[in-house]
């Protein structure tokens, strides 16, 4: 905790001048069969960091437990640059703003994900990535299998954003991805113990 608070000082946020709170926020990724204890760190009421102690991955206990510290860099910069809007952040010393770098991509990907993604093609892509991942798991090729699993998960997220997956279907899709993840973990762990 002390090391983390010192890191805030290094980037220009003096913890003595702000209301810093550690708020319990355990993490879970059902598609990955992953979970862990976690905390959000709030600065003056806004989340700026997430701590996660990964205790389970693909349904397996993590030994040892690993930790991830995720700084919400844009939010940290909002404090250090004293900005209320992320798009007003300076991106570089030449005066280029965050909006100039990222706004178009955010608009276009939002339009794609929520309005224009071809549902029929995405359903086929999900099946294709799932099939490829299963085939690679059978061949005991873990990393490309995991890559295909991540692609299937990404397609699932777009389908979910489009609102085409019912509650019952959602559970089924999550289970399908988790099954692949577990298979990948089994062959990975097996390869590491040889």
Residue ranges of predicted features:
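Structured aminoacyl-transfer and RNA-binding surfaces used for tRNA recognition/handling
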Residues: 1-192
């Amino acid at each position: 905790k002390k090391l983390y608070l010192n890191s805030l000082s290094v980037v220009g946020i003096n913890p003595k001048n702000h209301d810093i709170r550690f708020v319990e926020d355990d993490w879970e990724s059902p598609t990955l069969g992953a979970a862990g204890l976690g905390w959000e760190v709030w600065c003056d009421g806004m989340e700026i960091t997430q701590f996660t102690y990964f205790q389970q991955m693909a349904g397996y206990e993590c030994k040892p437990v690993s930790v991830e510290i995720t700084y919400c860099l844009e939010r940290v910069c909002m404090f250090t640059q004293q900005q209320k809007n992320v798009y007003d952040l300076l991106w570089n010393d030449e005066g280029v703003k965050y909006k100039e770098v990222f706004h178009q991509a955010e608009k276009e990907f939002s339009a794609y994900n929520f309005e224009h993604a071809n549902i029929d093609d995405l359903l086929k892509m999900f099946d294709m990535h799932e099939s490829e991942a299963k085939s690679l798991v059978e061949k005991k090729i873990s990393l490309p299998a995991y890559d295909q699993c991540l692609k299937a998960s990404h397609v699932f997220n777009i389908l979910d954003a489009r609102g085409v997956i019912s509650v019952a279907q959602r559970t089924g899709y999550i289970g399908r991805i988790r099954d692949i993840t577990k298979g990948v973990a089994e062959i990975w762990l097996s390869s590491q113990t040889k």
